[in-house]
From Swiss-Prot:
It holds the Pfam family DsrH. One of its GO terms (biological process) is tRNA wobble position uridine thiolation. Part of a sulfur-relay system required for 2-thiolation of 5-methylaminomethyl-2-thiouridine (mnm(5)s(2)U) at tRNA wobble positions. PANTHER family: PROTEIN TUSB (PTHR37526:SF1). This is Protein TusB. Belongs to the DsrH/TusB family. It comes from Salmonella paratyphi B (strain ATCC BAA-1250 / SPB7). Keywords: Cytoplasm, tRNA processing. Its main location: cytoplasm.
Length: 95
């Protein structure tokens, strides 16, 4: 399943998101959600042991001036790769 997070993590039920993550899922951070990808962010730390891949939309990272602060554990994607993720994961959950 592809989970999308367009908000700051404090604005969603993050414990529920963590509970629903399954092996092989992906979490795509976009809009203000890219702040989760900042190195040392407590929400990112809670994702470290999850059996998922965390992606962040590069354009949103750049728009917020966060390029140098993003964790190396987060995969940066552009809009084309965003579309590929939506095709790859038939099921999606928007937070």
């Amino acid at each position: 399943m592809l989970h999308t997070l367009p908000h700051c993590a404090s604005g969603v039920d993050f414990p529920a998101l963590l509970r629903l993550l399954k092996e092989g899922d992906a979490l795509l951070l976009l809009q203000d959600g890219v702040t989760v990808a900042i190195e040392g962010n407590r929400f990112l730390e809670s994702l470290r042991d999850a059996p998922i891949t965390v992606y962040a939309l590069k354009e949103d990272i750049d728009a917020r001036g966060l390029g140098g602060q993003i964790s190396d554990s987060v995969v940066r994607v552009d809009y084309t790769e965003f579309v590929r993720l939506t095709v790859k994961y038939a099921n999606q959950m928007a937070w």
